[in-house]
Amino acid sequence: MTDKQINLEVAYALPDRQALLEVVVEMGHTVEEAIKASGILQRFDDIDLSKSKVGIWNRTCKLSDVPQDGDRIEIYRPLIADPKEARRRRAEKAKEEGRANKVTGGRA
């Protein structure tokens, strides 16, 4: 490795398996270029970079961002349920079970 190359990790997880791949790229490569260089797109055909969000160390970023040496690039899966809708359903269930006030929604 020359001083113009950087070490990165590319991570992707499914409920039943995950991958953490190491890749060496030239300094100045973008997140998208690093993901493609890692080969992870060939291992997981469900990844669509035009739709998937990505991040570096658990902070979302753009595909055009430039990572630093030692960064972990993460590819995020879309949410299965809308968080607001899921919370509303839990609150309704709590009201029905008597664990929440039917008017205010607070604890009974």
Swiss-Prot record:
Matches recorded under Gene3D superfamilies: RnfH-like
Any Pfam family matching the protein: Ub-RnfH
Disulfide bonds: none
SUPFAM superfamilies named in the record: MoaD/ThiS
Residue segments, region Disordered: 86-108
Family in the record: Belongs to the UPF0125 (RnfH) family.
Name used for this protein in its record: Protein RnfH
The organism of origin for this protein: Pseudoalteromonas atlantica (strain T6c / ATCC BAA-1087)
Gene it is expressed from: rnfH
